[in-house]
Amino acid sequence: MSDVDMESGSDDSGMEDLDEEIQKIKQKMIDDSQSVVLANQLLILLRKNGDFDELDIKRRQFVEWAPLNPLNWKNWIEDFQNRKPEPSVAEVEEMFEKALFDENDVTIWVERAMYAYKVANDKNKKEDFKFCRDVCSKALENLGTRYDSGGHIWLIFLEYEMSYLKNSMNAPDYQRLADQVFALFERALHCPTDQLEDVYVLAEQFCTEFKQHHKLEELKKTYNSTMRQKEQLSKFEELIQQEETKKQGLKQFFDHEKKSGIPSRIKMAHERLVSELDDDEEAWIAYGAWADIELKLPQVAVKVYSRALRHCPYSFVLHQQALLAFERDRRPNEEIDALWERARSNVINSAEEGRSLYRTYAFLLRRRIHLTGSSDYSPMAEVFDEGAALLREWFSMAWDTTADYRQMQAYFYASLMKNMDKCRNIWNDILASGFGRFAGKWIEAVRLERQFGDKENARKYLNKALNSVSDNINEIYMYYVQFEREEGTLAELDLVLEKVNSQVAHRAIRPQKKVSEKPAPAPKSKQDHIQKRTSGGEPIVKKVKGDDGGFKAPLPPSNAKSSSAVSSSNASSTPAPGSFAVQKAAPGTEDARTIFVSNLDFTTTEDEIRQAIEGVASIRFARKANSDLVHRGFAYVVMENDQKAQQALLKDRVPVKGRPMFISANDPEKRVGFKFSTTLEKSKVFVRNVHFQATDDELKALFSKFGTVTSVRRVTHKDGKPKGIAFVDFDTEASAQKCVASGDKLMLRERELEVALSNPPVKKDKSHGKPAAIGASLEEDGPRKGHAAKLQLVPRAITNKTPQITARLDAMDVSEGTSTSQPLSNDQFRKMFMKN
C-alpha cells in the first residue's frame, strides 16, 4: 500500500493540486466505496491539506469498517495528543490499543514506548517508571522475537532501563536493579534480530559504564551463539527485501521458523506474514488455525480472527472459524450473534459457502441450547428454515446439489423437534428433486422412519423405491426383503418376494440394445501412429500398462532420439507386421552404460542413489508434472563406464530409504524376469515366521551351527516392509538337510522359526489360463445397473428358468433357485454348433 507524500507545499498551486487529488479520490470512492487503499489515501491528503474538520469525520467513519495503515494511526494519535484540553493517559493508551489492533507495527510500538517514557518522567503525571516498563514489556511480548522488528524494541527498552539505573546509583537496591538490566541483555542477545550487533554494542557499553566487566564474557558467548542463527535468517531476508521474490522469501522464512517448534518464534513468523501480506486470506486462516489447534489458547485465536476480519471482511472461511473460536472462548452470545449477522449479510457468494455457514451456526445453537438445559430447539429450526429458503431464492435449483443440507435438516426435525411430518416433507422434496433414482437416498429415508417414525411409512418408501430406483436396484431388493424379515409378517414377506421376483423377471426380458454391425475400422500401422504423434513437435510420452499390469517406463531421451533417427533412415524398408525395430545400444556408448532403477521413494535424491551405487556419472529422474520436488519413482542412471554398469546390476534390490531399489539394464525390449530359482533347491532352506525387525546377520549367526551359510535373503514387499519370510543358502546340501531334519527349536527374537527346503510353488500365468465354459456367468448379481437387462451370453434354447428369489424357512436368506438340468460342457456346445 503506497502512502501519499506527507510534505506539504507552501504555494497556492500546491494547495490547488491537493484539492484536485482529493476530488479525484472521492470520485473513485463513489464507484468503490469499500476500498481500503482509497480510504487511507484520502485521510493522508486531507491532513496534508489542513482539512481537519472533514478529516476528523472521515477518520471516525472509515475506522468503523476499514483498518487504517500505520501512518494514518500515528497521525491520528499525534493530533489526538495535541488537542485542547490535553487528553488523559488512559485515553491516549486506548488510541494506541485500537491502532495496534489494526496494525501490529513496530513504529506504533516505538511511539507508544516513547510516550510512556515521557509520561513517566513528567512530574505532573501520577505514572512512574513502572508504567513505562509495562508498556515496553507488552511491546516485547508482541514483537520481541520478530527478526525485522524485535531489535528496535529491545534497544529502546534497554536504553530506558540504563537511564533509570544511572539515576538510581545511590539507591539501596542498586545491585538488584543492575542484575535486572543484565538479565534483560541476556534475553535480548538470545533473540536473533536484525539489530543483534547493536544490542551487543550496547551490552558492552553497559558492562563498562556500570562496572560489570566480569559478566561481559558470558554475554559474548550468548551473542556468538545467536549470531549463527541470525546468519541463517539473513538469507531469507535477502529474498524478502526484493519485490519479485518477497512472497517466496516469506514462505521459506515461515517454514524455517515453524521447524524450530518454539511457539514464540512461530507466532512471530505468522505476525510477519500477516503484516507483510495483510489482505492475504490464506495467511490469516493459517494463523488462526495454528492458534486454535497447535497453541490451543482460545483467547489468542479470538484476537487473531477479530484482526483477520478487519483485513479480510469478505472471507466466509474466516467468519466460519471465528464463530467456532468465539464459542470455544465462551464469548457472550450477543458477540457471537453479531458476528453471525455480519457473516450472513456480507460473505455468502456461493451455495456451498451459504450451506457451510448456516450449518455451522445451526449446530452452534444446538450446543448453546444443550448447555442451558433447555429442550426448546426452535431457534435452531428457524436458522435451518431460513437457510433453505434464502439459498433456494439466491441459487435456485443448485442450492443443495448433494442434498446434504436437507438431510441434516430432516434428521434435526426427526430427532430433536419430534416433527416427523416436517421430516417427511423434506425427504419428499429430496427424492423429487432428482435423487429418487439412487437406492442410498431411499434407504436413508427408510432408516429415519424406522428410528423416529413408523413401519407403515417406511414400507411406503420401499414400495415407491421399487419403481423409482435405477441405480443399484439390487440393494433395494435386498433391503426390502430384510426389512420384512425383521418387521413384517409371513404374508407380508411373501408379498414382497412376489413383487421383487416379478421385477427381476421383468427386467430380465427387456429387449437388449442392438450391437452395431458396422465393420471395425482397419488398424493403423504403428509407423503412421508415430508420425501423427510426432508431427506436432516433441513425441508424447504416455503411461502404458505392461503385460503384468505394472507401469512400463518410457524410453530415456537418448533412446527416443535414436529411435526417431532409425525410423527416418530406414523409411524405405518395410518392417514386418506388428514389429517395431529398436536399435541396440553399441558397446561404449552412453546407452550401453545406462541402467534403469525403479521402486524408488518419490523423494529419493541423487545423493542417496550415488551412495548405493558406485561410479554414477549422471541421473535423470522422471519428474511429475509441475513439481520439481518429487518424481515418479524411477530414473535412468548413466554410469562412468561399462564395467561400473555391470557392477551396478549386481546390486539389484539394494535398500534405499527403506525400499528395495530395482536395478535392470536399459533395454526396453527385454522384460526382466524373476532372478531366483522356482524349483527345488536342496542347499537352500525356506524360513517362515521371521520377526519383522530381524537382520540378515542375526539369521546368519543362528543357522551357522548347521554349516557354512553363503547368503541370507529376507523377502520384502515393494515398499521395503518385510514379509516375515527368508531364504538361507548353505554351501552344501548336507548342511541344509541337517538344518531341516534337526528338530531343534529355532528361536529368534522370541519367535519360533519354521524351516523347509526351498521349493516355491509355480506362479500361475493368468494370461494363459483355461478359458471359462461358454455361457458361464461372470456375475451372480442378477440384472446389471440401470433399466437395461444384463447382456446374456447363453443361447435362448438352453437358457435356464429365470432365477427366483425364495424365502427358505431354514436359512431365511435370499438366494437364486438352481436348475435341475446339468450344465453343458464346452465339447457339447462345440458339437451342437458344428451340426449347423
Swiss-Prot record:
Task: Provide the alphabetized UniProt keywords.
Answer: mRNA processing, mRNA splicing, Nucleus, Repeat, RNA-binding
The GO annotation for biological process reads: mRNA processing; RNA splicing
What results from gene inactivation?
A: Lethal at the young adult stage due to a ruptured vulva. RNAi-mediated knockdown causes a partial reduction in the number of hatched embryos. RNAi-mediated knockdown in a usip-1 (tm1897) mutant background causes complete embryonic lethality.
Q: Where is the composition biased (Polar residues)?
A: 816-827
Q: Name one GO cellular component term.
A: nucleoplasm
Q: Carries keyword Nucleus?
A: yes
Q: GO molecular-function annotation terms?
A: RNA binding; U4 snRNA binding
**Region (Disordered) spans which residues?**
507-585, 757-786, 811-830
Localization, UniProt: Nucleus, Nucleoplasm
Q: Does the keyword Acetylation apply?
A: no
Ranges of compositional bias, category Basic and acidic residues: 540-550
Pfam families for this protein:
Lsm_interact, RRM_1, Suf
Annotated function:
U6 snRNP-binding protein that functions as a recycling factor of the splicing machinery. Promotes the initial reassembly of U4 and U6 snRNPs following their ejection from the spliceosome during its maturation.
Q: Which PANTHER family match?
A: EUKARYOTIC TRANSLATION INITIATION FACTOR 4B/4H (PTHR23236), NUCLEAR RNA-BINDING PROTEIN SART-3 (PTHR23236:SF119)
Q: How does it assemble?
A: Forms a complex composed of sart-3, terminal uridylyltransferase usip-1 and U6 snRNA; complex formation is mediated by usip-1 and sart-3 binding to U6 snRNA. Associates with U4 and U6 snRNP complexes, probably by interacting with U4 and U6 snRNAs.
> Under which name does UniProt file this protein?
Spliceosome associated factor 3, U4/U6 recycling protein
Q: Which organism is it from?
A: Caenorhabditis elegans
Q: Which gene encodes it?
A: sart-3
